[in-house]
């Protein structure tokens, strides 16, 4: 599902809100989440999951085109850990 599809689906389900209002709310929520992670803080949405930053240590990588070694710097990357309820709902698909 893309962001546009999410906005469309929510606007349909929440008929009291216009598509523009839903779009604005989604964009603001995503901006707040990005700002929180940018500040090094963790986001927890109970039942859904948590977002945090994980540190990736410096390492030697390879250029896939040439095969030459490339030194990659250490960096923080976003990480999502699903919550118990979300895991159970997804697991139910496999049962």
UniProtKB/Swiss-Prot annotation:
GO terms for cellular component: chromosome; cytosol. GO terms for molecular function: DNA binding; structural constituent of chromatin. Pfam families: Bac_DNA_binding. Keywords: DNA recombination, DNA-binding, Transcription, Transcription regulation, Translation regulation. The keyword DNA-binding applies. GO terms for biological process: DNA recombination; regulation of DNA-templated transcription; regulation of translation. InterPro entries: Hist_DNA-bd, Histone-like_DNA-bd_CS, IHF-like_DNA-bd_dom_sf, IHF_beta. Heterodimer of an alpha and a beta chain. Belongs to the bacterial histone-like protein family. This protein is one of the two subunits of integration host factor, a specific DNA-binding protein that functions in genetic recombination as well as in transcriptional and translational control. This is Integration host factor subunit beta.
């Amino acid at each position: 599902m893309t962001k546009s599809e999410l906005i469309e689906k929510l606007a349909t389900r929440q008929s009291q809100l216009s598509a523009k209002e839903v779009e604005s709310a989604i964009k603001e929520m995503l901006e707040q989440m990005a700002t929180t992670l940018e500040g090094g803080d963790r986001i927890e949405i109970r039942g859904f999951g948590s977002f945090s930053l994980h540190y990736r240590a410096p390492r030697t990588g390879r250029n896939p085109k040439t095969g030459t070694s490339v030194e990659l710097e250490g960096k923080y990357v976003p990480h999502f850990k699903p919550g118990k309820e979300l895991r159970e709902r997804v697991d139910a698909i496999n049962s």
